[in-house]
């Protein structure tokens, strides 16, 4: 009788999935047993696209719901966490046709974090993961790919142009596949900045000025240390003085990394 394989747990959001992906792809022939708890429902479609088999898939909205569902699972066997990888050796997402061909540098912009993270931070009284939409106009010297859900981008009132294009696919695989076209990324604390930093694309992160051990441990410190990411910490990004300071630092960073 074949011995049952140990259970591997993968939990979190889309950014976590991206860090789990290299291990999962490398170990597909071994067919590990995965229990997945995730607050981004689109991740389930990503598992299917990559042909990764999951034994149990559980979705949740907020952390208190996750704790309740974990208790209901009543996992009694030994398990391990899926190992994380900081960088992709090769981009696992199929490239898309280039959006721009005008010779200008292209930056990606992502204004919002996930609904889960936004709701949680409001509940905890922490700075929201949101950039003012006017940053798109203030960085108009570059081609811009604006990432986000359709309703998020529509709510900004921004318009597409020859140098501003929206990447708003409901199929998250398709949206993530456009990140590789960016020469640099300017983003809130979100999965898009995780994708760009894992591809070693220079990434400028606007992040709330609050303690967040897991955010810093997994999604910030490794990339800052590697020289891939630089951060600007804010209390309220829409406040004019803070915004202007963040914009200045963003422009200086882009000028530095894109001037070569």
Task: Report the location of each language-model feature.
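Short hydrophobic segments within beta-strands
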Residues: 9-10, 110-112, 147, 206
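Nucleotide donor/acceptor-binding cores
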Residues: 3-6, 104-105, 142
